[in-house]
Amino acid sequence: MSLTARDKSVVNAFWGKIKGKADVVGAEALGRMLTAYPQTKTYFSHWADLSPGSAPVKKHGGVIMGAIGNAVGLMDDLVGGMSGLSDLHAFKLRVDPGNFKILSHNILVTLAIHFPADFTPEVHIAVDKFLAALSAALADKYR
């Protein structure tokens, strides 16, 4: 699924509105994923506390949203721009790439909760397409 120029514009504009709360969104989305999809906890078994709002969940949620923020600036070459993270997740962390879709869903839910007025159908579609493209880029090294 390719991103149109309009999709990219919508994602950029929406990211401008949310970037100040990106850490909060990331922490909540990650906590939501770990609760709703407990099988994803296996990748974080080295954390002492996996509960929503815990320090490790908050920290990693911020890391995730920071990477997504970087990806917003790389929309014209997500595969190349996210190559390092793809390597990390495929070869070192060995994350099942299906989990990228699960996290993307939880990010969308969290964005809709935190930004109800801004999360219009057009924004929803564009951000969903962007996260799907990002997930595909992160899964690129799995092939």
Curated annotation (Swiss-Prot):
SUPFAM superfamilies: Globin-like. Transmembrane segments: none annotated. Keywords: Heme, Iron, Metal-binding, Oxygen transport, Transport. GO terms for cellular component: blood microparticle; haptoglobin-hemoglobin complex; hemoglobin complex. GO terms for biological process: hydrogen peroxide catabolic process. Red blood cells. Residues 2-143 form the Globin domain. It comes from the Eukaryota. Pfam families: Globin. One of its GO terms (molecular function) is metal ion binding. Heme b binds at H89. O2 binds at H60. Belongs to the globin family. Heterotetramer of two alpha chains and two beta chains. Involved in oxygen transport from gills to the various peripheral tissues. This is Hemoglobin subunit alpha.
